[in-house]
């Protein structure tokens, strides 16, 4: 008896040593419904399961791993192990790329189902009856160690699922953000959706009353575990570290290095300047150019104010004399043959007008406006469109409540009706609707509608439950799939993660039809939305594919330009009046008509060469040419008036010819400087800007020709018929302002130089603060509906634009090339495309996981994913999805597929399996390539010639963001020297200019300044004065640059051309004064001070009246333009130019010339004023 007791005791001890089972569940006891799953039977803790059979043990090892090989007792039957295997295989296609996550996932459910100590961490809390009237588990608690759960979640959270361009966690964990959400999703009862057949509640901190239980805390593997290491794309810890990017901005504290250097240099120069000024003042004891109470006559400046480089020259300027003689003959021919000149002019205008009406076209396509067809990015866009199809036509609508949450049940009801009408009923004039044009992921799919309504598949939810349902769908989008079967993340639909408190929701419709039918439907959509009655407190903004081009074309400021013309005409009529106050109405009209004629001639001439105009050219060029062209009319007319005063014995023709001889070299010099600057601007490759520069150049040339011929003829005819007798007398009244106010300011010329120099150096400090970009809201009229849309995109859109990495000419049938692309396998190159892009997500604007078709293709072949690549047994025929599993076998057998890529197809096999994959649907295998990748590859029977790998930028909310995103795309795509590839995104083509805009700006402005110096040196025959002219123009541009930073004028191709134009206009302010200072009558004193006074006496009035005030009046009108692009880039820049250039020309330049000006030449063509 004792022996039997001892044997029994030993047996019990052996069972304990070998792991006697403590079960909570064992076996299956039936279903809750006909279509439900088999549910386990609850068992008491005293229950002892039988020893595992060899067959069950072998199956358990196959499913759960080698560590189960020695297990003799388990809390599961063979049927449960089979069911466990089937359920685990559902998750394998999603997480098998990360062995650590897969191992942890399998371990959790293997222990939950079969562990011998199951009863120690599983507590059944609810039992129900099956259809067979047996007890079945309905709800239970699992006690889980929180550290184990956290490491489990961390091993899985970054696994990418390329087919959705998202994360596997979105599918297996409902988008969980932490381990508790992850396990809650896994444990929530979802029997009809393929989830848990009963409720599993995971608990992490045992309460006092739960101390009898133990926490599940088996071995867990990190994603960078040596044995189960995951690929870089799925595990940040496994990734190599990229070299840090060089910071392109040098700063010392908050200051750019350039600004700090300028400040230091400025401080040193300022000390020397004040010392110089103080010593000069002390030495001269306050001496000035003129006595405060005496108004000087020409040549009466204080001789103590000597030029630093004073020299005298009584020679004539040979080049100036030749030009004067040439244009004297032109003027003589014009006054002697006025009718021939005018008839020829009218005939030319008629011919060019005919050409315009017959052949001229306006360029309105935004792409053709902003990107050169020779641009690399334009060619890349063409390549993408030709090979992968044009990007979707996008219709996007924002519904916004700026004061509170946008969502209420009333809003839902209203929007469900609106959206249903748009997608189902709204039709164009051709009876074409959204269903006829929309994007469908597959041929048998429904239309893609990216809207929160699709969480409910377009059916209005119940009033009592809509908030709860919407929140659940927002947390777990995979549970609320729309009819097109793609999860919709909340960042795509709402302005905030807290969707019930979001201020806006976004609806996006996608069209793939790029025909006139799509245009007409979009026009109908636009009409409908503009007339849509919106509930109180809400507003909508929207954009259709045709909106931008249409609104740009509606940007009509012709009335503003017309008013500008009228204002300058009225001013010209007044400013050209005679000394007795009588106006010269005809001359004012003539000047205006000549400007218009030059524009017409230029447009017709360029039309012959196929150069298209744009709306901006049509609206801005007239103003620009009027602002430039009217100046020469003032110069000619004022010089003629001076001849009338000084040479009354001359005939009218002689006075006009003399005026032309005197002013023509100056006019030609200014004309060449301006046209040269405009031609330099033509080097900008952006078509709108390039064409603008060409039109400006040709218009200025025609304007100059017509002014020196047609206007001269009109002036001759007008003066002869008016029979005007010159009034002579004292000119002190007329010149009193200049002689008392202006010249007194000039007496402080050293102080003026110090002030302007300080201004210049201060401006240099601000230059690094100039921002790059061209805000889209500036390009459209301010009353356009697109203004609100662009603002809402920046404020409320939480998804960034897509990026496509296009790889060409790479033979992917070879293993070595496959390893340059892949990311999910252990032998992928360390710096493969997938690995580098995974790392770039952490430091660049590209933040979405890469949709890597090659990885998905190879994962599709994984035999563990037995619903993916299948062949009919014994044949090479593909098993259709509906074919029973027993009649199919996986393409690769167990053991022939490995994460080290051994056995992966190459050569001909690669293309054969590719054909199977690319035609496979996503159901039942999510890795099937047809839906996500059917348009991502260009291939034939032997090779893949090109393919795209999709990712996306983070939300871009400013022009700076867009520029940085473009730079990132270019930088990353160029970091693979062994690959023929480029990055493409629909917006890239508009940001090409910014890649080299900074250096280009310096080159073009520098070239323009050098050109001015060269031309002025040729005309003036004086290096020193030419240098001072170029210096003053440089200072004008630098000061304008600083004001651009302060006034919020960004640098882009438009403002760059304006800067070049500013160089040309800045020359106009200064060049006539410099030439008048250099070429003087023989009777004028040759010292610098006397020449400055002579220049201001003769040219100063024309600069003020003909140049400064004319431009000021014309520019001010632009402030009332509808388009902000006029306000910012034309009104602000040109207004700034007028003020800055006038101050420099009328104050700084005379002071500079009087101190440092070059030698003079005698002008024998005129006599000095008395």
Swiss-Prot record:
Residues 1-19 form the signal peptide. This is NPC intracellular sterol transporter 1-related protein 1. The keyword Transmembrane helix applies. The keyword Transmembrane helix applies. The lineage of its organism: Eukaryota, Fungi, Dikarya, Ascomycota, Saccharomycotina. GO terms for biological process: sphingolipid metabolic process; sterol transport. It is found in: Vacuole membrane. One of its GO terms (molecular function) is transmembrane transporter activity. Present with 521 molecules/cell in log phase SD medium. The chain crosses the membrane at residues 260-280, 341-361, 556-576, 585-605, 616-636, 667-687, 698-718, 752-772, 1000-1020, 1027-1047, 1054-1074, 1099-1119, 1133-1153. Belongs to the patched family.
């Amino acid at each position: 008896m004792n022996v039997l007791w001892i044997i029994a005791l030993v047996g019990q001890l052996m069972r304990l040593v070998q792991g006697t089972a403590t079960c909570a569940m064992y076996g299956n006891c039936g279903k809750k419904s006909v279509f439900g799953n088999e549910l386990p039977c609850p068992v008491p803790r005293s229950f002892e399961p039988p020893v595992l059979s060899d067959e069950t043990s072998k199956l358990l090892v196959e499913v759960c791993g080698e560590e189960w090989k020695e297990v003799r007792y388990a809390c599961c039957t063979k049927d449960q192990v089979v069911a466990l295997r089937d359920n685990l295989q559902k998750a394998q296609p999603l997480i098998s790329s990360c062995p650590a996550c897969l191992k942890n996932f399998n371990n959790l459910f293997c222990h939950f189902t079969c562990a011998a100590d199951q009863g120690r961490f599983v507590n059944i809390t609810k039992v129900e009856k099956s259809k067979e009237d047996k007890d079945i588990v309905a709800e239970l608690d699992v006690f889980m160690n929180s550290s184990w759960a956290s490491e489990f979640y961390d091993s899985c959270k970054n696994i990418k699922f390329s087919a959705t361009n998202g994360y596997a966690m979105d599918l297996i964990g409902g988008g969980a953000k932490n381990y508790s959400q992850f396990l809650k999703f896994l444990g929530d009862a979802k029997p009809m959706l393929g989830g848990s057949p009963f409720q599993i509640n995971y608990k992490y901190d045992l309460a006092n009353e739960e101390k009898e239980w133990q926490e599940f805390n088996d071995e867990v593997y990190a994603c960078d575990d040596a044995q189960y290491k995951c690929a870089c794309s799925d595990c940040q810890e496994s990734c190599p570290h990229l070299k840090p990017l060089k910071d392109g901005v040098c700063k010392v504290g908050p200051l750019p290095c350039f600004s700090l250097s300028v400040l230091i240099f400025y401080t040193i120069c300022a000390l020397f300047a004040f010392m110089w000024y103080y010593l000069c003042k002390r030495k001269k004891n306050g001496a000035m150019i003129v006595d405060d109470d005496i108004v000087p006559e020409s040549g009466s400046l204080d001789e103590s104010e000597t030029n630093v480089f004073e020299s005298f020259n009584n020679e004539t300027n040979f080049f100036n004399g030749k030009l004067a003689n040439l244009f004297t003959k032109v003027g003589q021919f014009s006054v002697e043959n006025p009718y021939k000149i005018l008839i020829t002019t009218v005939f030319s205008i008629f011919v060019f007008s005919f050409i315009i009406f017959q052949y001229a076209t306006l360029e309105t396509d935004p792409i053709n406006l902003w990107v050169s067809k020779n641009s690399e990015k334009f060619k890349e866009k063409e390549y993408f469109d030709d090979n992968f199809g044009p990007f979707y036509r996008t219709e996007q609508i924002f519904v916004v409540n700026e004061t509170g949450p946008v969502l209420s049940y009333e809003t839902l009801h209203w929007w469900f009706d609106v959206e249903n009408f748009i997608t189902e009923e709204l039709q164009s004039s051709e009876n074409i609707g959204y269903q006829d044009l929309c994007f469908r992921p597959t041929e048998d799919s429904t239309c893609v509608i990216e809207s929160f309504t699709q969480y409910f598949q377009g059916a209005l939810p119940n009033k009592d439950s809509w908030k709860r349902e919407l929140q659940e769908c927002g947390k777990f989008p995979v549970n609320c799939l729309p009819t097109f079967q793609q999860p919709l993340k909340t960042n795509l639909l709402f302005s905030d993660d807290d969707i019930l408190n979001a201020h806006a929701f976004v609806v996006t419709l996608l069209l793939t039809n790029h025909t006139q039918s799509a245009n007409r439907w979009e026009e109908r959509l636009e009409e409908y939305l503009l007339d849509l009655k919106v509930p109180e407190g809400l507003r909508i903004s929207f954009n259709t594919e045709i909106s931008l081009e249409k609104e740009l074309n509606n940007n009509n400021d012709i009335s503003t330009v017309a008013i500008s013309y009228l204002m300058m005409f009225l001013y010209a009529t007044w400013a050209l009046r005679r000394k007795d106050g009588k106006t010269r109405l005809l001359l004012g009209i003539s000047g205006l008509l000549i400007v218009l004629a030059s524009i017409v001639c230029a447009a017709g001439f360029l039309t012959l060469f196929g150069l298209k105009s744009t709306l901006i050219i049509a609206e801005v060029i007239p103003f620009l040419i009027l602002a430039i062209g009217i100046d020469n009319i003032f110069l000619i007319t004022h010089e003629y008036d001076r001849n009338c005063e000084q040479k009354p014995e001359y005939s009218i023709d002689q006075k006009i010819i003399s005026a032309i001889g005197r002013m023509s070299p100056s006019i030609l010099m200014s004309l060449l400087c301006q046209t040269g600057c405009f031609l330099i601007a033509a080097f900008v490759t952006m078509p709108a800007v390039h064409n603008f520069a060409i039109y400006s150049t040709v218009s200025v040339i025609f304007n100059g020709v017509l002014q020196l011929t047609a206007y001269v003829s009109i002036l001759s005819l007008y003066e002869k018929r008016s029979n005007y007798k010159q009034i002579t007398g004292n000119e002190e009244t007329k010149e009193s302002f200049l002689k008392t106010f202006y010249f007194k300011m000039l007496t402080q010329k050293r102080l003026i130089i110090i002030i302007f120099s300080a201004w210049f150096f201060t401006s240099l400090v601000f230059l690094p603060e100039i921002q790059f970009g061209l805000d889209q809201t500036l390009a459209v009229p301010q009353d356009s509906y697109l203004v609100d849309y662009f603002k809402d995109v920046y404020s409320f859109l939480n998804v960034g634009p897509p990026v496509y990495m296009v790889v060409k000419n790479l033979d992917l049938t070879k293993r070595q090339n496959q390893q340059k692309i892949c990311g999910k396998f252990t032998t992928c190159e360390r710096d493969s495309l997938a690995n580098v892009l995974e790392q770039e997500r952490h430091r660049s604007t590209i933040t979405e996981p890469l949709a890597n078709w090659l990885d998905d293709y190879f994962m599709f072949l994984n035999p563990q994913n037995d619903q993916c690549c299948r062949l009919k047994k014994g044949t090479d025929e593909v098993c259709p999805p509906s074919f029973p599993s027993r009649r199919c076998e996986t393409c690769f057998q167990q053991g022939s597929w490995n994460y080290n890529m051994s056995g992966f197809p190459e050569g001909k096999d690669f293309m054969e399996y590719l054909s199977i994959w690319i035609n496979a649907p996503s159901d039942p295998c999510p890795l099937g390539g047809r839906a996500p990748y059917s348009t991502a590859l260009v291939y034939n029977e032997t090779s893949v010639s090109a393919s795209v790998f999709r990712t996306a930028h983070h939300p871009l909310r400013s022009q700076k963001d867009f520029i940085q995103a473009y730079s990132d795309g270019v930088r990353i795509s160029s970091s693979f020297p062994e690959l023929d590839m480029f990055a493409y995104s629909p917006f890239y083509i508009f940001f090409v200019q910014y890649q080299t805009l900074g250096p280009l700006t310096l080159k073009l402005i520098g070239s323009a300044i050098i050109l001015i110096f060269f031309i002025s040196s040729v005309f003036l025959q004086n290096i020193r004065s030419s240098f001072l002219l170029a210096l003053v123009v440089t200072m004008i541009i630098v000061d304008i640059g600083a004001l651009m930073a302060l006034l919020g004028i960004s640098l882009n191709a438009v403002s760059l051309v304006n800067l070049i134009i500013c160089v040309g206009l800045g020359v106009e302010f200064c060049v006539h004064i410099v030439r008048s200072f250099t070429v003087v009558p023989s009777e004028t004193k040759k010292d610098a001070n006397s020449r400055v006074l002579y220049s201001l006496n003769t040219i100063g009035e024309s600069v003020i009246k003909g140049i400064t005030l004319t431009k000021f009046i014309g520019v001010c009108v632009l402030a009332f333009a509808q388009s902000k692009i006029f306000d910012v880039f034309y009104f602000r820049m040109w207004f700034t130019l007028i003020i800055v250039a006038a101050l420099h020309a009328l104050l700084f330049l005379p002071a500079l010339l009087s101190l440092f000006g070059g030698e003079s030449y005698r002008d024998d063509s005129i006599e000095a004023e008395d």
